[in-house]
Each structure stands twice: as structure tokens, then as C-alpha cells.
Amino acid sequence: MKIKKFLILALLIILITPGCSITKDSMEDITIYTTIYPIKYLLDSLYGDNATINSIYPSGVDTNDYELSDKKLEEYSKTDLFVFNSLDKDRDYAVKMINKNKNLKVIDVSLGITYVDDITELWLNPYNYLMMAQNTKDGLLEYIDNPYLISNTDGTGIENKYEELKYNLSRLDADYKEDINLATYKTIVVDDDMFKFLEKYNLRVISLEDNDNLTDSTINEVKKLVNNGTIKYIYSSKDETNDVCKNIINNYAI
């Protein structure tokens, strides 16, 4: 009797299993290439459990100066997915890689986004970075069929991860607003236009970046503010600042 029951159960399993088999999604366990860390961070956050994510750039290089060889582009074009920023030189790489592999999947994270002063606004500004996250999420969803990878009760789906990112970036945006609103003096001096995105929070940002926008009037105003003690710091994005800032620092003991 026990043997009969076992045989019946085994037969049922054989009959049922083909109809319930789970097909692995073509986007599982893939290799994704991207460019800079802010984009890689989004990919790691949204899909890092299901893919190997690498940068096309060697570690430690200045991506502004580094140029990829045609041999490297040939290699990267064979990957499963390339995620790039079309507002940067990434776009040229994407075009070359697509020309080498017409089947290459791509996602443009900067779709519909613009910047005013510096490209770093795309990831330093929480609102812009959230748009980048949404573009990354939407791009992944275009290629993925498995509902579990999209959203699940375990909280590991792309939609679940996106909601976490959205919450954290919204908190950061709120912190910016609150901290600047509580500041007694709402003017800062910086050495790079990348900080000017803070103006959206009603903070006056005086940039001493050495470009066509820098005037003698601006430099003289900063000297006056430093001299009378109103400004005590110049915020820098780099270890080495430009000559204009060095001159003010050396002559006014800031």
C-alpha cells in the first residue's frame, strides 16, 4: 500500500512539474558595464544581486582625460548591457559599441535631464539623481520579464529597491532644505561651479572657479567678505585649489 502511494505521488510530481517549471530570466546573472561611480552605485542598489557590475574605466584614473582604446570598446561591446550618460562622452562610447554589436542592450540614465553649471549636478542634486535612478529602473524593466525580479514580498525586486532609493534621496533633499533654512548666513564661497546646485535651496553660492564667468567684481567681493570676517572658509572640491583661491587664502589668512 505504501509503495502504491509513493508511485502515485511520484507520478503526480512528474506530471505537474513541467507545467510549473520556472524559466530563468535572460537578465539574471548577467554582466553590466557602466562608466562612473554614481551610475554604478545606482546599478548596484537596484540590481546588484542579479548581475556583475563593472566600470569600463580602470580604477583610479581621471575619467575626464582617459580614452578607451578601440580594442577595449570591442571587448565591452560583447557585454550584456551598457549603462551610460548621454550628456557626457559616454554617448560616443555607446555609439561605437552599438556599431560593433547591434544586439547590445543599452540604458541612458540621463534621459530627459539637463544641467546648468556643471555635469556633477546630475548626481549631487538629489532631484536629478532620483531621475537618474528612475531612468535606470525603467531601462532595466524594459528588458526583464520575471515578475519576481521586478517586485516581490522579500523586498529584493527592482521596484522595491527603487522605493528605498527614492526615500533616501527625498530625506537628503529635506535635510538640505532644513539645514540651509536654519543657517544664519546664507552665502558660501566655493572653488568650483559644481556647488552651485545648492542655489535651488536659497543659498547664495559665490564660485571662484577660474573660467569665463569669474569677474574682478566677484573676486573683490570675496576679498571684502573674507577681510571683514563674514566668510571664514572657501569650500573646495579638490585637494589642490586654483590660483585665485590660493591668492585669497595666502593674503587673507583664511
Language-model regions, residue ranges each:
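Sec-dependent N-terminal signal peptides of Gram-positive bacterial secreted proteins and lipoproteins
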Residues: 3-23
